[in-house]
Amino acid sequence: MGFYQGPDNRKITGGLKGKHRDKRKYEIGNPSTLTTLSAEDIRTKDRTLGGNFKVRLKYTTTANVLDPATNTAKKVKILEVLETPANKELARRGIIIRGAKIRTEAGLAVVTSRPGQDGVINAVLLKNESQGS
C-alpha cells in the first residue's frame, strides 16, 4: 500500500471537494525506516526523484563518534539507546533517530545524522558525560 502525501479530497466540515486532477507520482511517500540495533548492518538503497538515491539504514551495530576535545572520529560499538527528545516511545523501542542520546563504548553521544536517509550513524561525544559507560 502506498503513502499518499498530496491534498485530500475532504473539506474541514467533512464534505467532499471536487476532484480537479489525478494523483501524481511525486506525491507518493514511504514508511519510516526505524533504525534499530542488531548483530549486523543492513542497508537498503531507494531511488528517489531525479534519479538520486537514499541509503536507508535498517539495522546497525556501530556509529562514527567524533570527540570534540581531540577532534578525532572513530567507529565504535553502540551499546543502547538512552533517550530521544522527539518521542520517548522511540527510545523505549530502541529506535535511533537524529538527536537521540546513545551509549557507546567511547561514552555518551548524540546522533547528528539521519540514519533513515544517510545510511550511517554519525554522533558527537558529550563532554560532561564521556565517562558514563
Swiss-Prot record:
InterPro entries: Ribosomal_eS8, Ribosomal_eS8_CS, Ribosomal_protein_eS8_arc, Ribosomal_Se8/biogenesis_NSA2. Residues 1-22 are annotated as: Disordered. Keywords: Ribonucleoprotein, Ribosomal protein. Pfam families: Ribosomal_S8e. Gene3D superfamilies: 2.40.10.310. One of its GO terms (biological process) is translation. CDD domains: Ribosomal_S8e. GO terms for molecular function: structural constituent of ribosome. GO terms for cellular component: ribonucleoprotein complex; ribosome. HAMAP family: Ribosomal_eS8. Belongs to the eukaryotic ribosomal protein eS8 family. NCBIfam families: eS8. Part of the 30S ribosomal subunit. This is Small ribosomal subunit protein eS8. It comes from Saccharolobus islandicus (strain M.14.25 / Kamchatka #1) (Sulfolobus islandicus). The gene is rps8e.
